[in-house]
Swiss-Prot record:
It is found in: Cytoplasm. It comes from Streptococcus pyogenes serotype M18 (strain MGAS8232). Belongs to the UvrC family. Its main location: cytoplasm. The keyword Chloroplast does not apply. NCBIfam families: uvrC. This is UvrABC system protein C. The UvrABC repair system catalyzes the recognition and processing of DNA lesions. UvrC both incises the 5' and 3' sides of the lesion. The N-terminal half is responsible for the 3' incision and the C-terminal half is responsible for the 5' incision.
Length: 598
């Protein structure tokens, strides 16, 4: 804890409000709310915490706070601050959490469409449906039963669907409002499970078609009836009152929370939503934050009722969710919340079981790898790869795996400084010497195994640097790719030889992952350097364009092509004088002409 934090902790009020933790860059990494700011914020810097909270606290170098009039106001503010700043340690709802709805548009000639977004007063919405496939299947069925307009043809034309009896052309379909009201009512009844009348009507048409010997038409009606029956069986009835409601349950264990939401429409369970995340405050408070984000996202339909667990404050939920909030006390409704809670517990336990299996697999892979190579268990592995195009902008990268998992805070990038032209061996020699001379000089943690991306030549260079130049005793292995650029052979030993490695073994998958990761990291860094070098060389020697303005252009436009496409006004908006903008545009034009000249 630094002096700034110590001083600020003394000034905290005993009031409700929100606090914002910041890292060394000034970035907001966590937003929380508290009934008592002094007690809550001080708790982060006193006593012991679990591992994930320790990690959060280790990054805090400053904090701010905002005092509110009430706990409810603090909750609303917290939700807004999280959505605005997207702190990395706060609950994040998945990006793909929107569900499809069926919508009847409020156009003069209504259409039936699928959408994932709800707009107020923009039509009638039905759903949500669990996925696009289900929504499309229901829509196909409705299209065959109800002749909504399906095209955007001009008023004097009909479309293909009109000839199938599935589209109502502008000039032919009924234009009176009563017709459309009846059609929309029929769809509403159908989607709300009141489809007996529609089935009876279809059955009458099927029998009539059979009597007229129109067997193909009769078969179509039969298929429609079958489709309705299938849709009925896919929905589980959870409640007899046919009400639309969302049912929430949650469970916490080992610093993690799982929230389950059952979407019930017309008494039928149509989908559930599962979200697991670490929590840092009281479970009830983090659950409230989750609910606030869940419904503030416009992709979620707000039902007539929301059921919540016993421990949650109804008034606080009512402040953030504009619908009827119910905390069931007994009977079927309480059992529904209990069912959601039970499912949350099962999902969370499943996560822990999978994590435990993954840990056992990874640990086994490291043990087996050490046994195969005849070395101590390689808990820490450092892997290297070069990247360049015909020797231009040569770079290298190092990735670190600890206990079989990437330790990204230990990753390193290297710009090759002493090598001219495409010489991978010399580049590897320089980078390894720089890395491990520093490890030796500064007493940094050394790896249990070094892996280089390459064959015999690369491994021999690495061993020469490590053993002969630096006098270190760190095992060195090589990962060699085949002609399809896939991990193929593990090279190790003295003399070097291929280590037999079963392709389906956990240790092979671990090495494959390490090689892919170091290659990705090196190539990504090389692209960044190449782009920056290209950017800088084009803008060199322009009067009035110094390093800061170049950096500003690079951050905003990313590429020279983007600058070339920008207007003078767009570039000047960055605070660059008009005369300099004109010089930039002239330089880009001259370079383009030079490249196109024979």
């Amino acid at each position: 804890m630094n002096e700034l934090i110590k001083h600020k902790l003394e000034l905290l009020p005993d009031s409700p409000g929100c606090y914002l933790h910041k890292d060394k860059e000034g970035t907001i990494i966590y937003v929380g709310k508290a009934k008592n700011l002094k007690k809550r914020v001080r708790s982060y810097f006193r006593g012991s915490h679990d591992t994930k909270t320790e990690l959060l606290v280790s990054e805090i170098v400053d904090f701010e706070y905002i005092v509110t009039e009430s706990d409810t106001e603090a909750l609303l503010l917290e939700i807004n601050l999280i959505q605005k700043n997207m702190p990395k340690y706060n609950i994040k709802l998945k990006d793909d959490k929107s569900y499809p709805f069926l919508k009847i548009t409020n156009e003069s000639f209504p259409r039936l469409v699928i959408t994932r977004y709800i707009k107020k007063n923009d039509g009638l919405y039905f759903g949500p449906y669990p996925d696009s496939y289900t929504a499309n299947e229901v829509k196909k069925l409705l299209d065959r039963i109800f002749p909504f307009k399906k095209c955007k043809n001009p008023i004097n034309k009909v479309c293909f669907y009109y000839h199938l009896g599935q589209c109502c052309a502008h000039t032919i379909c009924h234009t009176d409002k009563a017709y459309w009201d009846r059609l929309i009512d029929d769809v509403k009844h159908f989607l709300n499970g009141k489809d007996d009348k529609i089935i009876e009507d279809l059955r009458s048409k099927m029998l009539a078609a059979s009597e007229e010997m129109a067997f193909e038409r009769a078969a179509e009606y039969r298929d429609l009836i079958s489709g309705i029956a299938t849709m009925r069986t896919k929905q589980r009835v959870m409640s007899k009152d046919l009400q639309d409601r969302d049912i929430f349950g949650y469970y916490v264990d080992k610093g993690w929370m799982c929230v389950q939401v059952f979407f019930v429409r017309q008494g039928k369970l149509i989908q559930r939503d599962v979200n697991l995340f670490p929590y840092y405050n009281d479970a009830e408070e983090d659950f409230l934050t989750y609910m606030g984000q869940f419904y503030q996202d416009k992709q979620h339909f707000i039902p007539k009722e929301v059921f919540i667990p016993e421990a949650i404050d109804e008034e606080l939920v009512a402040a953030i969710v504009p619908t009827k909030i119910i905390k069931p006390k007994r009977g079927e409704k309480k059992q529904l919340v209990a069912l959601a809670t039970k499912n949350a517990r099962v999902s969370l336990q499943q996560k822990f079981d999978l994590l435990e299996k993954d840990i056992k697999k990874t640990s086994g892979a490291i043990d087996n790898l050490g046994h195969l190579l005849g070395i101590n268990k390689p808990v820490r592995i450092e892997a290297f790869d070069n990247s360049n195009i015909q020797g231009t902008s040569p770079v290298a990268a190092m990735v670190v795996f600890v206990d079989g998992k990437p330790s990204k805070k230990d990753y390193r990038k290297f710009k090759v400084k002493t090598v001219v032209g495409p010489d991978d061996y010399a580049s590897m020699r320089e980078v390894l010497f720089r890395r491990y001379s520093r490890v030796k000089k500064e007493g940094l943690q050394a790896p249990n195994l070094i892996i280089v991306d390459g064959g015999v030549g690369q491994v021999n260079v690495a061993k020469d640097v490590i053993e002969k130049q630096l006098g270190l005793t760190i095992p060195v292995a090589g990962l060699q790719k085949n002609d399809k650029h896939q991990t193929h052979d593990l090279l190790f030993g003295n003399p070097l030889e291929v280590v037999p490695l079963p392709r389906r073994s956990e240790e092979f998958f671990l090495l494959h992952r390490i090689q892919d990761e170091v290659h990705r990291f090196a190539v990504t860094f090389h692209r960044q350097v190449r782009r920056k070098n290209s950017f800088s060389s084009t803008l060199d020697h322009i009067s009035g364009l110094g390093p800061k303005r170049k950096q500003l252009l690079l951050r905003h436009f990313k590429t020279i092509t983007a600058i070339a496409s920008a207007t003078s006004e767009e570039i000047q908006a960055l605070g660059i004088p008009k005369t300099v903008v004109e010089a930039i545009q002239q330089q880009i034009t001259d370079n383009k002409n030079d490249r196109s000249s024979p």
